[in-house]
Every structure is written in C-alpha cells, then in structure tokens.
C-alpha cells in the first residue's frame, strides 16, 4: 500500500519497498529496514486481543497479573467460545477519560444514579431486598481493578434467573448452573453464575459481566472528551431464545435507549463541569480506606487505578492527595 502524503510504498508486512526520489535518502541507504513501519506488539488471552505501543513491555500474562483469574471466571461460563454479538454502539462523553475509568468499577453510585432502573426491575417482580448486594472491590495491580457482588438482582443469562427473563428460560438457566457445578464444583459455579463482575483492565478496557455481558473500550479525544465503543458478547452455543434474552437484558441498561448509559453520561459530564473550577483541588477517594475487608461499594479499586496513573506520570505516592482529576 502507498502513503497518500509522500508516496512511500509498503508491503503487507510493513516493509518499505518503494521510495520516490531515492537518491535524496542515500545517507540512509536504499529502503533500509529502519524506515519500515514499526511492528506493534500484540497478544491474545482467552480470545481477547491486546496491543501495546510501548517499545518495551512485559508479556501479556505478566501485565494482566491477577486480572487473568477474573477473565477466566468470565470466559468459563460456557464450554463454547465467547463471541461478539453483531452490532455495538459508539458514543462520546464530554468528560475526561479517567472519569469513565473510575465509573466502570464504582458500585457506590448504583442506588442513586440508577434509581429509576431499580424501580423498573421492581415493577417486573424483582424483590427490592435483592438490590442490597454484598461483595468486594479489589485493586489487582498494574492499575487493574474489580468489583464483584451478589445476589445479581438483575439476573444473569448464565445462570441466575430473574423476572427480567422469560419464564420459559427457567429450566435451561437451571441446567446451565448444574453443568457449571459438574465442571467446577459448587463454590466456583456460584462465583461464575451468582455474582456480577465489572473488571477494569488499565488503562481503557472494561468487561461488564452483569445482566448482559458487554465489553467497553474508550479513548480520549480531548482533555474533556472521551470516545466510547461498547460491544455485547455471548457464547456460541446459545439458543435463539437465550440470545434474545441476553440482548434484551443488555439493552435495558446499556446504550442510548437503556436506563444506565444516559444516567452515567449525564453524571460524568456534570462532574467534568464541576472539576473545571480552579478552587476544586482534588477528588475524594477515601471511602473504605480503614476497614481490612474491602466492600464492593468502597473505593480501593479506584485508588489502585490512581496509584498506577500516578506512577506512570512519575509522581510520588503522597502527591495523590493533591491530584485534580480533571487534569
């Protein structure tokens, strides 16, 4: 292929094979390898493709560290392969990208920002007490983070029925759970099927294993704007009815017509406007710093993100107390 700017030509491996006016580049020789396109390192873990632009980096498995265990927990839901559901959607938020990184593993806001969604579930017959979940939040190292909680009042296609799903799916959902018990034992089966999980991979990937599995990546386009892409995901062995229930559950919360995404967009943009005030010097993430056990509604997982962000910027840990999150 040929660069439309100056006409340099490359083969499919990125090697430079054509150079107009070669004589002017005699100091560099004729089509030297160093003038070819830079090879980007990439690796795959459990069908997730990761790329890394830095010149030096650890192996993918080393970088993921403890986060691998939770990717496994998500992918082990089925013996079939995880697959992307055709479609997906893109949107932007007028807020700094780090606010979305925080939001992805923030369980504290659920009963407030998403109150209307919980009320909607109640109208379907969901027990209001089931919204009072128990769980934990974890900083997994390298900036990765997790919140995990249950019982999943919204239900889970694998494998926890709720009034959000058709009554006819009860037997197949129960059978999926029994198969998980056969494969992994009762304890791990319950971890897989009876808990909601939001896994953040530093710096810009969130895997939401909730009422409908979705994968979110995001990239800053300005200091006060972020571009977001969300894909739904499922498993290759699902029946048409199971896939329909998964998609319906997903879009009830995620996307422009869902209860959740518009709430989060409005809240984050409101936060961004507030952080523009010069007198606001920091954002408080001290919730849960005292207790030895980290609840999912505490903020250790958010502090883990900020520690890694600070480390990469070469800041001392004490400086975290002085950070303005809108920077």
Region spans (language model):
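Rieske [2Fe-2S] iron-sulfur-binding domain
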Residues: 1-69
């Amino acid at each position: 292929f040929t660069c439309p700017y100056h006409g340099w030509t490359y083969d499919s491996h990125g090697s430079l094979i054509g150079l107009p006016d070669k004589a002017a580049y005699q100091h560099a020789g004729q089509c030297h390898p160093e003038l070819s396109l830079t090879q980007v390192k990439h690796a795959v873990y459990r069908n997730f493709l990761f790329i890394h632009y830095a010149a030096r980096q650890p192996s993918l498995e080393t970088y993921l560290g403890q986060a691998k265990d939770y990717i496994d927990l998500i992918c082990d839901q089925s013996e079939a392969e995880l697959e992307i559901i055709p479609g997906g959607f893109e949107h932007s938020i007028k807020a700094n990208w780090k606010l979305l990184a925080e939001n992805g593993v923030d369980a504290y806001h659920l009963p407030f920002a998403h109150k209307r969604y919980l009320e909607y579930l109640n109208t379907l017959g969901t027990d209001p007490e089931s919204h009072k979940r128990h769980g934990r939040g974890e900083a997994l190292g390298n900036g990765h983070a997790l919140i995990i909680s249950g019982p999943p009042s919204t239900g889970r296609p694998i494998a926890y029925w709720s009034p959000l799903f058709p009554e006819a799916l009860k037997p197949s959902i129960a059978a999926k759970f029994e198969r998980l018990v056969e494969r992994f034992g009762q304890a791990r089966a319950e971890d897989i099927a009876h808990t909601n999980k939001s896994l953040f991979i530093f710096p810009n990937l969130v895997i939401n294993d909730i009422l409908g599995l979705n994968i979110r990546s995001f990239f800053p386009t300005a200091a006060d704007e972020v571009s977001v892409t969300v894909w739904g995901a499922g498993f290759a062995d699902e029946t048409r009815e199971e896939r329909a229930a998964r998609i319906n559950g997903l879009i009830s919360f995620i996307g422009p017509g869902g209860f959740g995404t518009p709430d989060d967009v409005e809240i984050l943009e409101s936060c961004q406007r507030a952080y523009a005030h010069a007198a606001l010097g920091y954002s408080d993430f001290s919730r849960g710093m005292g207790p030895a056990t980290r609840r999912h509604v505490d903020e250790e997982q958010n502090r883990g993100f900020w520690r890694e962000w600070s480390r990469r910027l070469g800041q001392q840990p004490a400086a975290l107390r002085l950070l303005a999150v809108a920077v």
